[in-house]
Amino acid sequence: FKSIHRLNFEKYIKYKFDIVINCSMPSKRFWAKKNPKKDYIETVEKTSFFLKNYKFKKFIHISSVSARCEKNTVYGKNKKNSEILVKNNNNKNLIIRLGPMFGRSLKKGVLIDMINSKTVYINGKSKYSFTNIKWIANWIIQNMKNKKGLLEIGSKDYIKLVSIRDKIKSKSKFIGRLDNQIIINKEKYKISSNEVYRFLKGKLSEKTN
């Protein structure tokens, strides 16, 4: 196992890997909108660099459902273009699209905004397939050798943001466009978006203590 980051990535050029997992792409949609050139470099050009300079049997590319549902945005376009590079590189490669996630390390995003009763700059009727990041990590570990192609993994269902706000009695207001982040896959996973409520309960408890 090798941990590759900004300070050592050049060290592993031509190194022979069995599997390379690329989770280096930016995940900030609003940042991408304000910094389109930087997002292109960090998403498309960086993926191209790894594909051209690293030796591997299989490349696992961690992408986003935005490549499907936000094709007209900078973020979505760049994610889609990076996927095309991976697909054309090797038919054994695996592209994993993720949706909204939650976990102990979460510090920003719509869930944190609602916990703190801040304005959420998305339409409240937006549907999100929230998924526990631990489940995602375990799925990748268990399936990285036998899966290939393009898969969206995550919760089998979704929750409207306004429903979460009302459930936790947040005072958040919603401003913005409809932004559905739903997992679409032939296989329906057992994990449910409703697990997010346990996470929110814990966060709210921490806030009051």
Describe the predicted segments one by one.
Residues 139, 143-188, 192:
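Mid/C-terminal beta-alpha module of Rossmann-like enzyme folds, strongest
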Residues 37-44, 72-83, 129-130, 158:
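Short-chain dehydrogenase/reductase
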Residues 1-13, 174-177:
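A short beta-strand-loop structural module common to alpha/beta enzyme folds
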Residues 48-76, 94:
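Conserved Rossmann-fold NAD(P)-dependent oxidoreductase catalytic core, especially the SDR/UDP-sugar
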Residues 9-46, 53, 64-69:
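NAD(P)H-binding glycine-rich loop region in Rossmannoid oxidoreductase-like domains
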Residues 24, 60-64, 97-99, 154:
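Active-site beta-alpha turn of Rossmann-fold NAD(P)-dependent dehydrogenases/reductases
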Residues 191-209:
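Amphipathic terminal alpha-helices
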Residues 84-135:
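NAD(P)-dependent short-chain dehydrogenase/reductase
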